[in-house]
């Protein structure tokens, strides 16, 4: 994804007929892929507590998701995705209050920043794109990702990418429309894979996030929190 774009997304629980419905709506299957994501944080989960999500995708590289200006929007979330390593390092140092580490590779600052692996799992994903009927064919297409993690949890994501905050409301309206067409209940919430992983395999970390967010809603990740994490 191009640096600096804003990701607006909603997670949902896909059913056995979701792919067929996407085809009926004119969706195009872009690809099917299998990949491993590894997430990093401090022992205190300082990044997650600050709504920042650092991961390394196998054969793809590093990504840091940071909250957009609006942050969590009901059942939707808005995040900026950083993929340039010097930019990621600068943001990590800012969030963790570290100075003097320069702007080098992410791997080189993991130890100095006290970052360690907190989760790692494999996902099988199908990626779809489509343009809603009644919208400008030249507008950016909506993305729908359907993923199943190797620990058995499946989650879908409807996503739009925009360049500036002023475009977010229109993107949200499209996400609402497509979610409804896919049969997603208006009030449905779906945790990101990372959150379910922590709940099942790192319950102490999950409980820490619950405590931090006790005055807010249950941590939904952004995915990321997914709801930020893919």
From Swiss-Prot:
It is an enzyme of class 3 (hydrolase). InterPro entries: CYTH-like_dom_sf, CYTH_domain, THTPA, ThTPase_euk. This is Thiamine-triphosphatase. It catalyses: thiamine triphosphate + H2O = thiamine diphosphate + phosphate + H(+). Its EC number is 3.6.1.28. Residues 5-201 form the CYTH domain. The keyword rRNA processing does not apply. Monomer. It comes from Macaca fascicularis. The gene is THTPA. Pfam families: CYTH. The modification N-acetylalanine is found at residue 2. Keywords: Acetylation, Cytoplasm, Hydrolase, Magnesium, Metal-binding. PROSITE patterns: CYTH.
């Amino acid at each position: 994804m191009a640096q600096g774009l804003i990701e607006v997304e909603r997670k949902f629980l896909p059913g056995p007929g979701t792919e067929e419905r996407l085809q009926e709506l004119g969706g195009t299957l872009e690809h099917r892929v299998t990949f491993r994501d590894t997430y990093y944080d401090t022992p205190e989960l300082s990044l997650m507590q600050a709504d920042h999500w650092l991961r390394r995708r196998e054969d793809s590289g590093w990504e840091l998701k940071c909250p957009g200006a609006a942050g969590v929007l009901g059942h939707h979330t808005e995040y900026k995705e950083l993929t340039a390593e010097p930019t990621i390092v600068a943001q990590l140092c800012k969030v963790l209050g570290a100075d003097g580490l320069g702007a080098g590779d992410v791997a080189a600052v993991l130890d100095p920043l006290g970052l360690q692996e907190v989760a790692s799992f494999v996902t099988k994903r199908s990626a779809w794109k489509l343009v809603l009927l009644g919208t400008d064919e030249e507008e950016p297409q909506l993305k729908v990702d359907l993923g199943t993690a190797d620990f058995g949890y499946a989650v879908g994501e409807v996503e739009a990418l925009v360049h500036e905050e002023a475009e977010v409301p229109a993107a949200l309206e499209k996400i609402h429309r497509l979610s409804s067409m896919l049969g997603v209940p208006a009030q449905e919430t779906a945790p990101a894979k990372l959150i379910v992983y922590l709940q099942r395999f790192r319950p102490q970390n999950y409980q820490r996030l619950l405590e931090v967010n006790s005055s807010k809603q249950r941590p939904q990740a952004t995915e990321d929190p997914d709801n930020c994490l893919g």
